[in-house]
């Protein structure tokens, strides 16, 4: 029994070190300088070590909103709001999670109103996030059950979209203004 406890103690310590290293890397990414989107999000997918990396991209919102049902923020139920952005530099589009809204006062069958994404060129800064697995649920028009990028792209009628997304931190229009947006998640 003592030998087993000894080995399990080292195993537990190794797990602690791995988690501490991962948490340190995530903290560095979360607070770090933003890098161009294409350095982190690629058509082959987000590398594990790049999760929560700050990215920036300039482009034009071209589709949305699509609402992610079954979300919560600070203990309140609601929806997250997704928009499709086409980068000015070309290449695949990227889905941007612009924030959180509470459900409509008229019930679950009515989607809430949200501030629109800005027209024209916008520079988005946020965190690279891995797309989610499909929950296999049929969703009403304009909604999805998870941030599964093929399902989101189908709801937005978008083609050529990256398999991962950006969680919005800030955005600025070409004239330097900050557009109105749903409640931030980051």
Model-derived features: positions:
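Surface-exposed, charge/polar-rich loops and edge strands
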Residues: 1-186
